[in-house]
């Protein structure tokens, strides 16, 4: 493919325009008085959202060079989201301010490399200052963090705090859509483990990169499945039932995995495969725990059970299964509480009998997974659009709360960033030349979040910043007053703030040192195909893979067996 090249100031200006286009769309959402953004969807009603990462992922610009600038800022938002679960808007605002100041100084003749070194020295001091200001989560802090991160929704803050109290901070808390208008909290049987889908082609929600099934059946086996013949009988039975299927095995690969993917993509069967958790004998124990939880039968050689004899009655059942790239959460029904209680009692007896610290640790983990349950926040709203927006806010609040438990909390509302900016004055005096300018770039950027929070609340950002510096207090954008934000319960997770600053500096410092931009040259649109036929001509059946007939699976792309 042909490439387009852009050099020097021209290339950096194009990147900056792309950065500004995306950041200007995202920054209107920052703060408790932030506005919403309407996103057009190819199908269905538009979404109205207040989530920085969701907005950033939707933006695609016509100009290829500007689009690269937008993509770089998308990376800031996505990296912060992946690591902290929140803070994407703050990271975007910080990155935009650094890019703007950095490119302005570069155009004036400053050395991009020295600017970057100055910014890196400054961010190291900012991180140290953040750790010193951080306070551990105690008392009502969980509710406060969740309330602030959800846009000031007290109900969400209360619900997340209650969920963490009931299943512990390390417990499994999921967010799902409710069939009613009310938002409710429910604690049910369930389990989570650190294994993800065997193939990304099982994803059902492309935006969140997860596979989610309602009321699935679960096949549990400690065997490796490579041949599709092993799965044919159970796949036929599940297809007739109309239920989704989760295959939880030692491993699913080769012909078996390929066939599951093909039939999933063709819409013949809702199916996903996940590797079983743990290893060796502990894997069998973990699978047996899941079998008890879901009411299924573990298909194992130890029990003289084989896959080709599996009946629907051998499959486990769950209310919902959510599978990401790295984790799987099973929300069970309440039909097997007594069996789960008996299983926990048996593990406790095993715990009392062992002298090994390692075994005790693993047994305690199994007890926690079985007995801890899953807290489910069911999100309700009058319209589907409002429901999606509210669900995103609750997910952000939950992620921010977990981050707060990890690294503590700091005063919110941009107050901490403003204080950290003023704390860089000593470093500015120590350095000189372009490195000093690099520190000043970060200093000015750290003020940007509170400026935009004030602006979105209808106040003059410069006036608010000056008043905060004079009073030594934070700005409450909800009430328009100056007060001790920590005492008022307006707090941020220190981890979220740290990652927002670090990710923004990382991308901005790379962007200002850019000298050449290379982009794909847009190809002219192809003329329409005459006759409207499918140029691919169809994929045909799975017989082309040389598989033998397997018993009536013709509807799934496989020839029937005689």
UniProtKB/Swiss-Prot annotation:
<dbReference type="Pfam" id="PF00118">
    <property type="entry name" value="Cpn60_TCP1"/>
</dbReference>
<feature type="binding site">
    <location>
        <begin position="29"/>
        <end position="32"/>
    </location>
    <ligand>
        <name>ATP</name>
    </ligand>
</feature>
<feature type="binding site">
    <location>
        <position position="492"/>
    </location>
    <ligand>
        <name>ATP</name>
    </ligand>
</feature>
<dbReference type="InterPro" id="IPR027409">
    <property type="entry name" value="GroEL-like_apical_dom_sf"/>
</dbReference>
<dbReference type="InterPro" id="IPR001844">
    <property type="entry name" value="Cpn60/GroEL"/>
</dbReference>
<comment type="function">
    <text>Together with its co-chaperonin GroES, plays an essential role in assisting protein folding. The GroEL-GroES system forms a nano-cage that allows encapsulation of the non-native substrate proteins and provides a physical environment optimized to promote and accelerate protein folding.</text>
</comment>
<dbReference type="GO" id="GO:0005524">
    <property type="term" value="F:ATP binding"/>
</dbReference>
<dbReference type="GO" id="GO:0005737">
    <property type="term" value="C:cytoplasm"/>
</dbReference>
<dbReference type="InterPro" id="IPR027410">
    <property type="entry name" value="TCP-1-like_intermed_sf"/>
</dbReference>
<dbReference type="GO" id="GO:0051082">
    <property type="term" value="F:unfolded protein binding"/>
</dbReference>
<dbReference type="InterPro" id="IPR027413">
    <property type="entry name" value="GROEL-like_equatorial_sf"/>
</dbReference>
<dbReference type="InterPro" id="IPR018370">
    <property type="entry name" value="Chaperonin_Cpn60_CS"/>
</dbReference>
<comment type="subunit">
    <text>Forms a cylinder of 14 subunits composed of two heptameric rings stacked back-to-back. Interacts with the co-chaperonin GroES.</text>
</comment>
<dbReference type="GO" id="GO:0140662">
    <property type="term" value="F:ATP-dependent protein folding chaperone"/>
</dbReference>
<comment type="similarity">
    <text>Belongs to the chaperonin (HSP60) family.</text>
</comment>
<dbReference type="GO" id="GO:0042026">
    <property type="term" value="P:protein refolding"/>
</dbReference>
<protein>
    <recommendedName>
        <fullName>Chaperonin GroEL 2</fullName>
        <ecNumber>5.6.1.7</ecNumber>
    </recommendedName>
</protein>
<keyword id="KW-0067">ATP-binding</keyword>
<feature type="binding site">
    <location>
        <begin position="476"/>
        <end position="478"/>
    </location>
    <ligand>
        <name>ATP</name>
    </ligand>
</feature>
<dbReference type="InterPro" id="IPR002423">
    <property type="entry name" value="Cpn60/GroEL/TCP-1"/>
</dbReference>
<feature type="binding site">
    <location>
        <position position="413"/>
    </location>
    <ligand>
        <name>ATP</name>
    </ligand>
</feature>
<keyword id="KW-0143">Chaperone</keyword>
<feature type="binding site">
    <location>
        <begin position="86"/>
        <end position="90"/>
    </location>
    <ligand>
        <name>ATP</name>
    </ligand>
</feature>
<keyword id="KW-0413">Isomerase</keyword>
<keyword id="KW-0963">Cytoplasm</keyword>
<keyword id="KW-0547">Nucleotide-binding</keyword>
<dbReference type="GO" id="GO:0016853">
    <property type="term" value="F:isomerase activity"/>
</dbReference>
């Amino acid at each position: 493919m042909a490439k387009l090249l852009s050099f020097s100031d021209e290339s950096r200006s194009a990147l900056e325009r792309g950065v500004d286009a995306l950041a200007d769309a995202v920054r209107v959402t920052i703060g408790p008085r932030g506005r919403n953004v309407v996103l057009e969807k190819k199908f269905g009603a538009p979404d109205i959202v207040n989530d920085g990462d969701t907005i950033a992922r939707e933006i695609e610009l016509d100009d290829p060079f500007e689009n690269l600038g937008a993509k770089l800022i998308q990376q800031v938002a996505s990296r912060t989201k992946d690591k902290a679960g929140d803070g994407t808007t703050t990271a975007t605002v910080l990155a935009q301010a650094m890019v703007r100041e950095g490119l302005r100084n570069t155009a004036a003749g400053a050395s991009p490399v020295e600017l970057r070194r100055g910014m890196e020295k400054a961010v190291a001091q900012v991180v140290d200052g953040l750790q010193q200001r951080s306070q551990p989560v105690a008392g009502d802090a969980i509710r406060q963090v969740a309330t602030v991160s959800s846009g000031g929704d007290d109900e969400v803050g209360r619900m997340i705090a209650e969920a963490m109290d009931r299943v512990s901070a390390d417990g499994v808390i999921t967010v799902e859509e409710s069939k009613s208008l009310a938002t409710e909290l429910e604690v049910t049987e369930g389990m989570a483990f650190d294994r993800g889908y065997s193939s990304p082609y099982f994803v059902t929600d492309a935006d969140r990169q997860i596979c989610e099934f309602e009321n699935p059946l679960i096949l549990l086996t400690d065997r490796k499945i490579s041949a599709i013949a092993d799965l044919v009988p159970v796949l036929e039975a599940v297809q007739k039932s109309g239920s989704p299927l989760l295959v939880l095995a030692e491993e699913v690969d080769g012909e078996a995995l390929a066939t599951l993917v093909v039939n999933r993509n063709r819409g013949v069967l809702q199916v996903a495969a996940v590797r079983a958790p743990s290893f060796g004998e502990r894997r069998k124990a973990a699978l047996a725990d899941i079998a008890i939880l879901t009411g299924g039968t573990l298909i194992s050689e130890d029990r003289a059970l084989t896959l080709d004899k599996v009946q629907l009655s051998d499959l486990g059942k769950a209310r919902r299964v959510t599978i990401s790239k790295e984790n799987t959460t099973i929300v069970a029904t309440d039909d097997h509480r007594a069996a789960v209680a008996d299983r926990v009692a048996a593990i406790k007896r095993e715990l009392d009998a062992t002298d090994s610290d390692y075994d005790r640790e693993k047994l305690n983990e199994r007890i926690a997974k079985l007995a801890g349950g899953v807290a489910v926040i069911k999100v309700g709203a009058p319209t589907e659009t409002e429901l999606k927006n509210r669900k995103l806010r609750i997910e952000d609040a939950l992620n921010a709360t977990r981050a707060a438990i990890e690294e503590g909390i700091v005063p919110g509302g941009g107050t901490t960033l403003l204080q950290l900016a003023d704390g860089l004055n000593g470093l500015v005096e120590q350095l000189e030349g372009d490195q000093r300018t690099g520190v000043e770039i970060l200093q000015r950027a750290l003020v940007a979040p509170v400026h935009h929070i004030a602006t979105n609340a209808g106040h003059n950002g410069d006036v608010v910043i000056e008043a905060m510096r004079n009073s030594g207090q934070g700005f409450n954008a909800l009430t328009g007053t100056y007060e001790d934000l920590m005492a008022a319960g307006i707090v941020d997770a220190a981890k979220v703030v740290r990652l927002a600053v670090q990710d923004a500096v990382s991308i901005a410092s790379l962007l200002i040192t850019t000298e050449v931009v290379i982009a794909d040259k847009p190809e002219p649109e192809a003329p329409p195909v005459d006759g409207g036929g499918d140029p691919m001509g169809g994929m045909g059946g799975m017989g082309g893979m040389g598989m033998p007939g397997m018993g009536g699976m013709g509807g799934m792309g496989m020839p029937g067996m005689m």
